[in-house]
A protein has these predicted regions:
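Positively charged n-region of N-terminal signal peptides that target proteins for export
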Residues: 1-5
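Generic detector of short alpha-helix boundary/capping microenvironments
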Residues: 6-7, 234, 370, 449
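Bacterial N-terminal signal peptides
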Residues: 6-16
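Generic alpha-helix initiation/capping and coil-helix boundary signal
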Residues: 7, 120-121, 349, 353
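A residue-level signal for beta-strand positions that form part of recognition/binding surfaces
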Residues: 15, 45, 376-379
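N-terminal non-catalytic accessory region
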Residues: 17-206, 210-284, 290, 298-311, ...
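Alpha/beta-hydrolase fold catalytic core
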Residues: 140-141, 148-170, 174, 297-397, ...
């Protein structure tokens, strides 16, 4: 009996050593033939980065507002730096009319730290470009910069850079113009190289984080703006006419609690970076458009009750959040140097916050409207669900906030937010309820940045783009 017990114990102890060994796929072997094929009918790719994924430069001074890190970087705690980083404010003006001299100037690729609660996806963006390179896509930005010599071969991958501070619907309209421009380029190159006149060009779009919201608005509404009266635009799927595949990597479709926390508190990206005050961040409409939905109960008062509307300006003013925080008056003074009266400056700041909140409410309602996309548009979600991610916060009578609950996600975006899951906890026995009709969903056990490093991400993305069946 002892001998049998010893043998059994030995077998049990040896089981882990006999377990399966997982290997990463040989992507070159899998996709090299497809990648090397010159196919005039292969869809070109547009890559859209998310928050902070584009370099920002002041057109007047040449100063790099975002994208120069270390010595010489713009400090948002100085008068000049604060006004460069923040967007202008002005009472009686629409958000779209509040312009400064800063513009996007290309995409970034390799900076990694946390900002606004979102790990900067710049490294993730590089990994996306590297993956597409394996698939044989020739990137215009890399080619024109001389980073890669493609010879005389035409470009099949385009980086869409944009000012990520602005209203996301505005960025979607810029995307509409960008796609029209690249359509003409692809048509001209295809006729020149293959003698084929393309009547239309369909693109595949790959997005990361907030870039997914830019693309989602575009495929739904094309270049249409949000109406000034607060109503929703007509859902035409105008942009979907130019898109076959839309890949969204870690998109905050249902918002992120981190966006709320950093609008309230400001943020210090990393040890070597300056603090970005709440008033500076509060000038950026896009950040409000990343707020979580009230119906998902991300916020509770000191009695455990959810406020009816997270976009209610009175809620923010009564709790002294963001631009409404009296402690931000010094920053507001730096942002409005021509306004002598403290009362007038506060009036302008509160007006800006109100406009940004109402615009965000309108924008998210436009995205959340349930609708079936055209059959030709296929949607792929790649998200993380193995990291604890902020889910619920509670505020006391003085407006102070404490995170109370976490949930599965990628450390930045909840699984439920990426899916745009409308189920409440008591309904999780039912199948997914979402206004987004996903064609394919892939969960990766990585954080917000690590998703694009995972071999499963690379393999599945290339299959989806290169091999998956398409509508004729």
């Amino acid at each position: 009996m002892r001998a049998m017990s010893a043998i059994f114990l030995l077998l049990v102890l040896s089981l882990p050593a006999c377990g399966p060994v997982y290997h990463s796929p040989d992507l070159g072997d899998l996709y090299s033939e497809l990648a090397q094929r010159e196919d005039p009918y292969r869809n070109p790719i547009i890559v859209i980065p998310g928050l902070l994924g584009s370099k920002l430069v002041d057109q007047k001074s040449g100063a790099v507002v975002w994208g120069a890190f270390g010595l010489g970087q713009v400090d948002p705690n100085t008068k000049t730096g604060a006004r460069l980083v923040a967007l202008p404010m002005g009472k009686g003006k629409r958000l779209a009319e509040l312009r400064d001299s800063t513009a996007s100037d290309g995409a970034l690729d390799r900076v990694v730290f946390n900002f606004l609660g979102f790990p900067v996806e710049l490294n993730a963006y590089y990994n996306i470009l590297r993956t597409l390179g394996v698939g044989g896509y020739r990137d215009q930005g890399l080619g024109e910069a001389g980073a890669i010599d493609y010879g005389d071969r035409h470009f099949t991958c385009f980086q869409f850079d944009y000012d990520w501070r602005h209203d996301i619907a505005e960025s979607a309209r810029e995307l509409d113009r960008f796609i029209k421009e690249k359509t003409r380029y692809v048509q001209e190159e295809t006729e020149k190289r293959f003698g084929i006149k393309l009547a239309e060009v369909k693109f595949d779009i790959v997005t990361h984080s907030m870039g997914g919201l830019v693309a989602r608005y575009y495929v739904r509404y094309g270049g249409a703006d949000l109406p000034d009266d607060g109503s929703l635009p007509e859902l035409t799927w105008a942009g979907a006419r130019h898109v076959d595949h839309l890949v969204m990597i870690g998109p905050p479709n249902g918002g992120s609690l981190d966006a709320f926390l950093n609008l309230v508190n400001g943020v210090s990206p990393a040890t070597l970076f300056p603090h970005y005050p709440a008033a500076v961040i509060g000038t950026m409409p896009a950040v409000y458009q990343l707020l979580p939905r009230s119906r998902h109960r991300p916020l509770l008062d000191d009695q455990g009750r959810p406020p009816p509307d997270i976009y209610d300006p009175d809620l923010w003013q009564s709790n002294g959040w963001g631009l409404a925080d009296p402690d931000q008056k010094k920053v507001v003074k730096m942002l409005l140097p021509d306004i002598a009266s403290p009362e007038k400056r506060r009036e302008i700041a509160l007006d800006h916050q109100r406009k940004a909140l109402l615009r965000a409410k309108q924008f998210t309602a436009a995205l959340d409207l349930p609708a079936n996309p055209p059959p030709s548009l296929r949607l792929l979600l790649i998200a993380g669900d193995a990291e604890e991610t902020k889910k619920t916060a509670q505020f006391d009578s003085r407006g102070r906030i404490t995170v109370k609950e976490t949930g599965p996600g990628d450390g930045t975006v909840l699984r439920s937010s990426a899916l745009m899951d409308e189920r409440v906890a008591s309904e999780l026995k039912t199948r997914l309820v979402s206004p987004i009709q996903w064609d394919q969903v892939l969960f990766v056990f990585s954080d917000h940045l690590g998703i694009t490093k995972d071999p499963a991400f690379t393999d599945n993305l290339l299959y989806f783009l290169l091999e998956s069946p398409r509508e004729d």
